[in-house]
Amino acid sequence: MTKAIVLGGSRGIGKAISNSLKSIEIDVFSASKKDIDTSNLESVNKFLEIHNETDILILNTGGPEPKPFSKITEEDLNKYHNQLFVGFCTILQNIKIN
């Protein structure tokens, strides 16, 4: 059976993607924030220990929380960079796509 992992698959567009894949009999793991936090590389690596192979991978996590630009700190920028780039790169380098 074809397997899929949908990050951000518990609501919104990700949930719609998950439901669409399920409707064509694909075995879907819909990952939520509690399953993986792409801004935290320890969380990403822990996720990859369990979910290290799939046929389909959808990278659909949410973005940073809204905040006035003037209030964004260097720490925030590092978190956003991890969340939307480094976390995804780590996943892509370490997961086997069949």
Briefly describe each language-model feature range.
Residues 67-68, 93-98:
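A short helix-coil junction within the Rossmann-fold of NAD(P)-dependent oxidoreductases
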Residues 41-54:
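Conserved amphipathic alpha-helix within the SDR
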Residues 11, 62-65:
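Flexible cofactor-recognition loop at the NAD(P)H-binding site
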Residues 58, 87-95:
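Hydrophobic positions on the long internal alpha-helix
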Residues 31-42:
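Rossmann-fold cofactor-recognition segment
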